């Protein structure tokens, strides 16, 4: 039995199969995403979803889906599946599914009477193209396949409806057609590796619904355009490949291309290999720049997410060169920001006050994975520029006070990772001395001090250490309370006593102002009140305002976003903290905690981790189907565990 295998019983039960999604991407930000029964349930779903830079910086759904029909003796068996009004599903092709497997590539096996048909999909790595291979495993009479493409040509943020502006024109190309519904879009080429007949029958399929959007309180129906259908005969043992892309391809190359792409894939045959494959999906290369996307299907490259994710997505899977490529792009953005220049790359939210400190943390992980010497040679000047920028009080919203702590104004704007807003106002106004920002600050001071001292700059090292002494003393005085945990933020007489996970970073980081007893007290309360099988809760059930369920319309979800939901990426730092306290004796506990996350490999987005979970049982996955920080941090912990187990 393969690691990611789903049998007929699960597949034909839509309550079980529809919540499970698959995601495949290439390095340009394009992707294919749908459910494991190929029924689109989100406006973001599609067979071919690509960036169209001349229109905007969003992705666009070109080919929404492809309905297949098996024809024998004039009888038609449609394998497609769409949801329409009134919980009506048609044409119910899922009832023919015998099994689905995606350990290597997504493969669905259908049984229609005496016909056994296997469908395999692969998203090409280095171009915007999806290939689908149909193999007739068994048949006792002449068989024809019909392919009916459903076109959208719209942004993932919008819907399309029947209209007179959509072009119905098409042109024949070798073994297929090309078409483009609206100006500004690339042409869509749909071709087969075998001669076929295209029947031009333009039609709009009206009222297709996306239940995931309905759950989230958004509009949820659209019309999709079908230009006609392809028909091709297929023999027992024969394979036919359908290609959809934005450039023409020689049909004679399709078989070779498909096989080469398959050979290039790492099977998802374990927890680690699932996460490693998922890690590769967040990389986005645009000309000279290399980014990390925060998540799929709707996130872009956000600075904080990128720096938190970078070590886990690269160093933890032994891809140091990828780390350096991403950091080269990030370095340009950091230099732009420090110099007060417009940021000339697509990294968003560079001005958030913790971003530069997370960049230092990421480089600290690089130093640990390579060497301090290599880090100093490659990034020493950047680290010194960052620390000097903050110490000279040049940051727009990071103010170094005489007590050595950093102050940030978040009263009117969400400035940390807890960034939900309603009507333009932060749901959690974290302002003043913020606990993880100052933990990052202390860690950065000590790390850079050690780095530059080893490089011969004792004067700067002594200055940074002196600063850290002041910062560390104030940190304990300001944040630690009589109950042994840390206040979340402090602004004058205003103190946030909520039990939140942001204190765990102080225990996890290499350098901490807390002693071992103080660290253990923090770890104990986090374990007792915030730990779940899926991550750390963002708020203790004992604190006021606890709301563990991320459900309902946008506003309701925004209020719940960081008020009790559980986030897997925090588990990474929690496990690191646990191992710092308990060392070898903590390994078995950490390994047990990972079981709840490995269980997610066959749920939600198969082979990846979603954005967040409800904070109470059954801890249902919510939000974006695949989230970079979550995947990264669990990979980082798996790498850390491997070092302990040497």
Mark where each language-model region is:
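Carboxylate/His-rich catalytic cores and anion/metal-binding grooves
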Residues: 243-277, 308-313, 318-328, 516-529
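Inter-helical turn/loop segments and adjacent helix faces that build the functional surface
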Residues: 252, 366-378, 447-464, 517, ...
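Catalytic cores of carbohydrate-active enzymes
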Residues: 273, 391, 398-401, 442-550, ...
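Aromatic-rich carbohydrate-recognition surfaces in CAZymes
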Residues: 138-139, 160-163, 172, 234-236, ...
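Terminal accessory carbohydrate-recognition/targeting modules of carbohydrate-active enzymes
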Residues: 1-267, 297, 304, 319, ...
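Glycine-rich, acidic and aromatic/proline-enriched surface loops and short helix-turn segments
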Residues: 277-285, 328-336, 599-606
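Non-catalytic C-terminal accessory modules of carbohydrate-active enzymes
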Residues: 79-105, 112-114, 392-395, 524-532, ...
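Carbohydrate-binding/catalytic loop surfaces
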Residues: 280-301, 339-358, 362, 366, ...
């Amino acid at each position: 039995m393969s690691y990611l295998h789903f049998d007929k019983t699960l597949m034909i039960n839509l309550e079980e199969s529809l919540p499970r999604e698959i995601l495949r991407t290439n390095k340009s930000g394009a992707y294919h995403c749908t459910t494991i029964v190929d029924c689109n349930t989100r406006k973001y779903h599609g067979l071919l979803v690509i960036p169209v830079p001349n229109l905007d910086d969003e992705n666009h759904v070109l080919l929404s889906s492809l309905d297949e029909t098996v024809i024998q003796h004039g009888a038609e068996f449609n394998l497609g599946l769409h949801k329409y009004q009134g919980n009506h599903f048609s044409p119910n092709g899922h009832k023919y599914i015998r099994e689905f497997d995606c350990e290597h590539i997504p493969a669905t096996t259908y049984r229609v009477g005496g016909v056994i048909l296997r469908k395999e999909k692969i998203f090409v790595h280095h171009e915007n193209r999806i290939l689908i291979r149909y193999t007739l495993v068994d048949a006792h009479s002449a068989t024809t396949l019909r392919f009916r493409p459903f076109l959208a040509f719209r942004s993932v943020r919008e819907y399309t409806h029947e209209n007179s502006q959509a072009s119905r024109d098409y042109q024949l190309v070798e073994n297929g057609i090309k078409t483009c519904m609206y100006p500004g879009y690339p042409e869509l080429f749909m071709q087969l590796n075998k001669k076929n007949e295209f029947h031009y029958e333009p039609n709009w399929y009206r009222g297709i619904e996306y239940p995931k959007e309905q759950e989230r309180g958004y509009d949820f129906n659209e019309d999709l355009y079908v230009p006609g259908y392809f028909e091709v005969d297929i023999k027992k043992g024969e394979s036919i490949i359908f290609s959809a892309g934005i450039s023409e391809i020689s049909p004679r190359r399709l078989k070779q291309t498909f096989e080469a792409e398959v050979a290039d894939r790492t099977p998802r045959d374990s927890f680690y290999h699932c996460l490693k494959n998922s890690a590769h999906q967040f990389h986005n290369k645009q000309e000279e720049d290399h980014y990390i996307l925060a998540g799929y299907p709707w996130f872009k490259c956000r600075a904080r997410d990128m720096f938190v994710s970078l070590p886990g997505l690269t160093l933890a899977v032994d891809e140091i060169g990828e780390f350096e490529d991403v950091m080269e792009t990030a370095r340009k953005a950091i230099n732009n920001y420090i110099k007060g220049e417009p940021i000339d790359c697509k990294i968003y939210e560079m001005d958030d006050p913790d971003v530069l400190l997370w960049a230092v943390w990421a480089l600290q992980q690089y130093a640990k994975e390579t060497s301090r010497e290599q880090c100093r040679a490659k990034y020493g000047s950047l680290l010194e520029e960052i620390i000097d920028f903050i110490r000279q009080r040049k940051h727009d919203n990071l103010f170094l006070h005489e007590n050595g702590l950093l102050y940030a104004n978040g009263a009117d704007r969400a400035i940390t990772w807890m960034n939900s807003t309603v009507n333009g106002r932060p749901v959690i106004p974290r302002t003043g001395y913020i606990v993880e920002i100052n933990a990052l600050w202390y860690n950065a001071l000590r790390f850079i001090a050690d780095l530059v001292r080893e490089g011969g700059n004792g004067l700067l090292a002594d200055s940074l250490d002196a600063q850290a002494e002041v910062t560390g003393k104030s940190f304990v005085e300001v944040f630690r309370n009589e109950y042994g945990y840390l206040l979340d933020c402090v602004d004058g007489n205003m103190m946030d006593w909520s039990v939140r996970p942001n204190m765990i970073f102080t225990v996890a980081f290499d350098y901490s102002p807390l002693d071992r007893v103080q660290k253990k007290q923090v770890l104990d309360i986090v374990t007792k009140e915030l730990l779940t099988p899926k991550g750390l809760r963002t708020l203790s059930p004992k604190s006021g305002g606890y709301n563990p369920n991320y459900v309902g319309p946008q506003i309701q979800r925004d209020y719940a976003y960081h008020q009790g939901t559980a986030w897997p990426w925090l588990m990474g730092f929690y496990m690191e903290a646990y191992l710092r306290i308990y060392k070898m004796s903590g390994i078995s506990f950490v390994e047990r905690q990972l079981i709840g996350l490995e269980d997610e490999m066959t749920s939600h987005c198969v082979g990846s981790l979603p954005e967040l979970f409800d904070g109470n049982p059954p801890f249902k996955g919510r939000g974006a189907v695949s989230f970079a920080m979550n995947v990264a941090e669990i990979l980082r912990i798996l790498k850390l565990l491997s070092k302990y187990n040497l």
